[in-house]
Design a protein with these regions (language model features):
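Subset of outer-membrane beta-barrel
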Residues: 1-368
């Protein structure tokens, strides 16, 4: 188990849509960067506790990891209202252009001290795949199209699915699955892999008598040690193709409008990373303070802890909307921070007043 930091950036370059009766068609271009850095807990354990005492025989795993997925999505979406406007279902089909990727497939570096002989045993298994034409100038990428848009050989497809249902006039239920798909990396690839995955080296120390008594024998012993270390930690580099998932996520939630200005919600979130499942449950409160200002608060339970408090602020200036949301605010003050999310953005809306009038008119008709 390690401590990790997640950083996510979503930049929406273009998003527009139009309605045809009960159907909605959309098109969007979004740039996404998903980054995860894993810091091995055992690194801090051995630094503060050492490898002796109760840690004799303990297998320290210094499995530092780095994963970066940088893509640009071209999405076509469709949604439709059903059951008297109560149910809306939809989806988006996305062509995904891969721009940069660093994926750590294996990162085991295990260190053990034998409790009887005090010999050190080290096992290594490392495999990292990259394709970084935009970031790495050493690859000699001079094509401006590749630098801006990425290589056409690095691409894939994805899909988003979602639905919402108005259970009553005040309660809305929703569910969605996003970023299902894969990107295939065929250009500017680099693969670094252990030549002997899982190879083990045991170090029992050096017999000082060999060096004092026979310098030739001592030199040969040192060379043998060096050769063994090179065999265990040797890395091979090639340029094979590989693929990565889009790091899919799912959401299930409900929202209740207490009145026109206040609502409460519950959201179940889940994601998969490195063959592990990361769920989270969030309770939220949102209030509209006048026509300009909106505030929100949240409490989240996740694998990282039970003290995740979040706050949000939004300012509505006519067609311009500005917002900022942050969570795990307690962790930033008490010193046990593991993960913090900050989201901020700006929206410019078109035709909102006309749509709101049409929606209000439809509700008034349905109540008659």
């Amino acid at each position: 188990k390690g401590t990790f930091v997640n950083i996510g950036i979503n930049q929406e370059w273009l998003n527009f849509g139009f309605r045809v009766k009960k159907s909605m068609f959309t098109f969007g271009i979004t740039e996404k960067i998903k980054t995860r850095v894993d810091f091995p807990t055992d690194l801090f354990k051995v630094a503060f506790e050492g490898n002796g005492g109760q840690n004799l025989g303990y297998a320290f795993n210094f499995n530092f990891g780095l994963d970066v997925l940088h893509t640009r999505e071209f999405a076509v979406g469709y949604s439709r209202s059903m059951l008297n406007e109560k149910l809306r279902v939809g989806g988006r089909l996305k062509y995904v252009r891969g721009l940069n990727v660093i994926t750590t497939k294996s990162n085991d570096l295990i260190f053990t001290t034998d409790p009887n002989t005090f010999a050190y045993t080290v096992t290594a298994d490392i495999e990292v795949n990259t394709s970084t034409p935009v970031l790495d100038s050493s690859l000699g990428v001079n094509n401006p199209t590749v630098l801006v848009l990425g290589s056409p050989k690095n691409g894939g497809f994805g899909i988003d699915l979602g639905a919402s249902y108005e259970l009553t006039d005040r309660i809305t239920l929703s569910a969605s699955i996003v970023d299902l798909g894969r990107v295939f990396w065929n250009d500017y690839t680099t693969n670094v892999k252990s030549r002997n995955p899982g190879a083990t080296f045991t170090y029992r120390g050096i017999d000082i008598n060999e060096y004092l008594g026979d310098s030739v024998q001592g030199s040969a012993g040192f060379e043998a040690l060096t050769d063994t270390l090179q065999d265990v930690f040797a890395l091979d580099t090639n340029s094979n193709s590989f693929s990565t998932g889009l790091l899919g996520e799912f959401y299930m939630g409900g929202n209740i409008n207490l009145n026109d200005r206040h609502n409460a919600g519950i959201l179940l979130y889940g994601s998969f990373y490195n063959r592990s499942f990361y769920p989270a449950l969030t309770l939220s409160w949102n209030s509209q303070l006048g026509r300009i200002l909106a505030v929100s608060g949240s409490y989240t339970i996740s694998r990282s802890g039970f003290t995740n408090i979040g706050l949000g602020l939004a300012v509505n200036l006519g067609p311009e909307q500005f917002y900022i949301v942050g969570d795990n605010l307690i962790g930033t003050t008490v010193g046990n921070l593991q993960t913090v999310y900050v989201r901020f953005g700006w929206n410019h809306t078109f035709g909102r007043k006309k749509y709101q009038k049409q929606k209000s008119k439809q509700k008034n008709i349905s109540k008659k």
